A protein has these predicted regions:
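An edge-strand/N-cap motif at the start of beta-rich repeat modules
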Residues: 1-30, 276
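Residue position within the beta-strands of beta-propeller blades
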Residues: 4-7, 54-55, 96-97, 139-141, ...
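Beta-rich, blade/repeat-based domains predominating
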Residues: 14-16, 35-49, 78-94, 100, ...
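A short loop-to-beta-strand structural motif that recurs across blades of beta-propeller domains
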Residues: 16-20, 61-64, 102-106, 152-156, ...
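Structural recognition of the beta-propeller blade-terminating site
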Residues: 23, 56, 65-66, 107-109, ...
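Structural signal for glycine-centered tight turns and loop->strand junctions in beta-sheet-rich domains
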Residues: 26-28, 48-50, 69, 92, ...
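A short beta-strand motif characteristic of beta-propeller blades
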Residues: 27-35, 70-77, 113-121, 163-170, ...
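Blade-level signature of beta-propeller repeat domains, shared across WD40, Kelch, NHL, RCC1
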Residues: 245-278
Length: 278
């Protein structure tokens, strides 16, 4: 099952500004789709019901892409959208983090209905990634923005209830970039602290969702460069993958062992990754 990676461009990184494809053995397959609507691509998620790839584009739109690399749905340009990460929620809708508005919205998978704000505007200083727990709870990483402002925390929300977010994680060594839910239900976060520093410590950190305590720290242990970690995804076989500056790094989640660079590409500047059969 190929790995698809969004490669940043512009202020988000000197990458290719494209959706790139790799084999699981690391071979680079090239650009998955050539389309002018895709520029500085960001979040990705797969709708397994329809086998469609949903992509957040820096052109202020969300696209749905078929397995043959064709855009089949398009929100059209939404003024000021500035999307970040994307994930499907328990109700089947596609949720998108907004960088400028600092909130999360929901879209129907048809991409032709009105946008719904599921959290208030400016709910965090800078959203860095989010995912839904096994019980439907929403976990949101609050990190440092490009201007150097923000905080470093993980918040928990119960949608549909009065808004009473709880600060799940306060870890002095954490500066989150993305967040995923592990098979065991815990929160897994990619981190670079201090954010943007040349000597930043990059890691993947696992937290218990009940009380927020740090369970484990995943480190490259010399098997990968692991600079500027960003998007996280679990593969169907349970391995954990994290995209970074010049590589995609794998971890055996059961043992915590780093598997090294699964794929390498100079200037990758990866933002998000998914596993998408095509």
């Amino acid at each position: 099952m190929p790995i698809l990676v969004t490669s940043a461009s512009g202020t988000n990184g000197n990458g290719f500004g494209a959706l790139l494809a790799f084999e699981l053995d690391g071979r680079f397959r090239g650009t998955f789709i050539e389309d002018d609507r895709i520029a500085d691509p960001r979040g990705l998620a797969v709708d397994t019901e329809e086998n469609l790839l949903f992509l957040n584009s820096g052109t202020d739109r969300v696209l749905a892409i078929s397995s043959d690399g064709t855009v089949v749905r398009d929100t059209g340009r939404i003024e000021g959208l500035n999307p970040g990460g994307g994930n499907f929620g328990p109700d089947g809708r596609y949720f998108v983090g907004l960088r400028s508005a600092r909130t999360i919205i929901a879209l129907s998978t048809s991409l032709d209905a009105a946008v719904e704000h599921v959290l208030p505007l400016q709910v965090v200083p800078f959203p860095r990634g989010f995912a839904f727990g096994h019980d439907g709870q929403l976990f949101l990483a609050s990190g440092i923005g490009p201007n150097g402002q923000g905080d470093n925390a993980i918040l928990a929300f119960t949608l549909g209830a009065p808004l009473q977010p709880s600060r799940l994680v306060t870890d002095p060594e954490l500066s989150p970039l993305d967040l995923a839910i592990a098979p065991n239900g815990n929160v897994v976060v990619s981190s670079e602290r201090p954010f943007g520093a040349l000597d930043a410590l990059a890691s993947v950190r696992e937290y218990d969702t009940k009380d927020g305590h740090l369970v484990r720290v995943f480190s490259p242990n010399g098997k990968a460069e692991f600079r500027k970690p960003r998007g996280l995804r679990f593969a169907p076989n349970g391995l954990l993958y994290c995209v970074a500056l010049d590589e995609v790094v794998g971890f055996d989640f059961a043992s915590g062992e780093c598997l090294g660079a699964i794929a390498r590409l100079p200037r990758l500047n990866g933002q998000a990754l998914v596993f998408f059969p095509y």
